[in-house]
């Protein structure tokens, strides 16, 4: 049985080949192996968004935020998906959460 990383790599290859449906299938296979594989959820969210399947993409992106709440990129990604879906207020909300996280990290690191 392939590992989550191997299935993830297969999904990335599908994206590179323009096969987004194949990528979605491979990301889902990776997540069946490891349900907490944040990179798999991230890739799945992006592929789904590119397919216009925004509700599913947002749900996957929310899973990334839950798994990696201190990673600013996860907030940026979900904000981008919401904007692409036409939900600008929700996009701004997620972007603001990401900015607050960044500011907190800067304060923690002693940066002005």
Which residues make up each language-model segment?
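Terminal, low-structured helical/coil segments at or just beyond the last alpha-helical repeat
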Residues: 1-4, 80-112
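Structural signature of tandem alpha-helical TPR/SEL1-like repeats
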Residues: 3, 16-28, 51-63, 85-97
């Amino acid at each position: 049985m392939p590992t989550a990383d191997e299935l993830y790599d297969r999904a990335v290859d599908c994206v590179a080949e323009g096969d987004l449906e194949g990528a979605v299938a491979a990301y889902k296979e990776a997540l069946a192996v490891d349900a907490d594989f944040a990179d798999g959820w991230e890739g799945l969210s992006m592929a789904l968004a590119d397919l216009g399947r925004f509700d599913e993409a947002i749900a996957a992106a929310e899973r990334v935020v839950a798994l990696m709440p201190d990673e600013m990129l996860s907030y940026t990604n979900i904000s981008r998906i919401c904007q692409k879906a036409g939900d600008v207020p929700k996009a701004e909300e997620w972007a603001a959460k990401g900015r607050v996280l960044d500011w907190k990290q800067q304060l923690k690191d002693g940066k002005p």
